[in-house]
């Protein structure tokens, strides 16, 4: 049981007249409904990290000497210390010498946490499992109490094996991301120690001072977004070319690709032009392009210029100056770096060096104009931002069409008058550490006679006998293929990507050779980047708001097979909340949660168990004695809030809150042997409906979103749980007796080989069925969709619709509702019905 004075030890150790730490006397009001989490980097007698989880009105706290680690193989000692007040999660400052914990403190990470089991029980038993949703740490974690001796309880902090885990030798989050998430501070080193370079805010009005010449500066990369963000931004045209960094030392010029390959010898005219700037120690950043007759960048022409030795046609459009004449400008504001660069290039209109001008138009108008002109899109850069050698939310790109690089995995032979190749087979690597190569479709248009010949010549030496793909697509999709080693990239535009990750209406634009094939994992538009200074309003980076709920990590993939993000899932639930709430609003709700997406661990949750979701209702504990409260979802806010906390599926009881002891429906879940053809499922559904017709009961149909069909039979609230379940079981057994070759009334895979199990078990008290219009946690994110009985013969599968194709389904219905008569259906179980089933 929580202490009546949980902060007594905290207060005893501190003199709040001297220390800036919060006293905790005024409890922090919780407006989000989320449980807070934070990690503070504390430079006390020894540098360590304080790990804190909100519970029962305080922050449970552990000192982690070596800090958190994303590697599940690494256990980090965590010494439990006194509880801290909730306000401490925002504390940054310097604790004076001579006081407890003297030294500097920054907020290294913060966000929300979700217990995966009862957290009080976990703390008592010594094993707390939870999910983090922070700016740096996320996914599932464990705190495990040890038997190590010490003055204080000693635990291990361990990362679980999930999609957020990373091996320590590949990524050390403490070294890679050392700074504050609250203020962009870094801890200063003690005397005689070296500090990790900090990601400081950009400076205005002064340079970085004379510093050693960097051997290499990796370029800053832009993040793909769907719409222009708010805030102060400068926009330029997006150039369809090759990224190039220029290093000038003692007047000697080197031209380097984004991966550090030296292209100086390939571009002597640019080497000469850059030398003509008279620079001695500088780095410049820009893009190689070739312009067509109308002055537009032409990627195919750029390739041809390299292939045909006509490099003099290549222009170098410069847009940044990260290092200038011995001064490191990476921490200087964007507009000041660009002003210096523009001055360098002034008056060189006939030169192959050009300046990428800032365009003053509204970004939406600018993008529309760029698209009309056939350009690739626009680039936005946040005013005041520093130059960072990584993909950044300070640089964004808005594209006119879906266009990206793909790995060529094979080609088909030409037909008819076409020569050299028919089509290219394309692949993309998975973004995880396993880097699996998956099939992404074909491209057969956009080629010229010359490019067909060139592509064939490039691919023939790469020919191999077997497919390089992790999963070979069916021959009907690919035809006869010559597979190749996955080394060559091409750039392709396309109209859409299907839920299976296959591109449609693809157009070839050229081969690429400026990056390794294994880097090509595909792009997915992100939400607008956060405003500078907006961190205090948000518990995590890269957030978006949907139905009034802030979505953390909006671009986290819920289903990599269709590149479906957490934000897309949240937006689906906001858009179709009215449909979902018809089933959810008046019933206890259970959740299927997958914080790491469908590929991670999934768990079923029917009780609150300290889970806080904005807008969700915790029901009277007396409804389910001996357990935490049941859950109820009444609003779009609660629905989207559940998605924010990792929920994917929503299940409901067969009784409403009007009378939880009297079910108002029963469900027959037709669950097939996976090997059965779909036709057998349709026949089984019709046979089950026929039996219900004979009994005088009307059923309403929906696809399960999985493999089977659900038949929902409304009832007047006259029967108890046992009576309803017994009746549903009688139907199941009756079908199995009549047609034992088709139906089974016994659960378990062994009992439904070649058959369909008529699952009646969902009719027990506390059992539940996936709600109508709920997404399923399966590949493709299918949806459980109501259908008319007359549509049965035309159904193609139980997973026919998913979160992206449901809008088309609803448009086709044009307002017709397959369940329009559901609420008005009045029927009950009679003695005559029982006798028909042999239960008289």
Swiss-Prot record:
The record marks 84 as: Transition state stabilizer. Binds 4 Mn(2+); 2 Mn(2+) for polymerase/primase activity, 1 each for 3-phosphoesterase and ligase. Changing residue 21 to A: Loss of 3'-phosphatase activity (in PE domain). Mn(2+) 4 binds at residues 669, 759. Changing residue 671 to A/E/N: Loss of templated DNA synthesis (in Pol domain). Its EC number is 6.5.1.1. It catalyses: ATP + (deoxyribonucleotide)n-3'-hydroxyl + 5'-phospho-(deoxyribonucleotide)m = (deoxyribonucleotide)n+m + AMP + diphosphate. Changing residue 710 to N: Partial loss of templated DNA synthesis (in Pol domain). Residues 1-32, 189-211, 514-546 are annotated as: Disordered. Residues 7-162 are annotated as: 3'-phosphoesterase domain (PE). Changing residue 76 to A: 1% ribonuclease activity, 16% 3'-phosphatase activity (in PE domain). Residues 549-793 are annotated as: DNA repair polymerase domain (Pol). The N-terminal 3'-phosphoesterase domain (PE) has 3'-ribonuclease and 3'-phosphatase activities. This is Multifunctional non-homologous end joining protein LigD. It comes from Pseudomonas aeruginosa (strain ATCC 15692 / DSM 22644 / CIP 104116 / JCM 14847 / LMG 12228 / 1C / PRS 101 / PAO1). The gene is ligD.
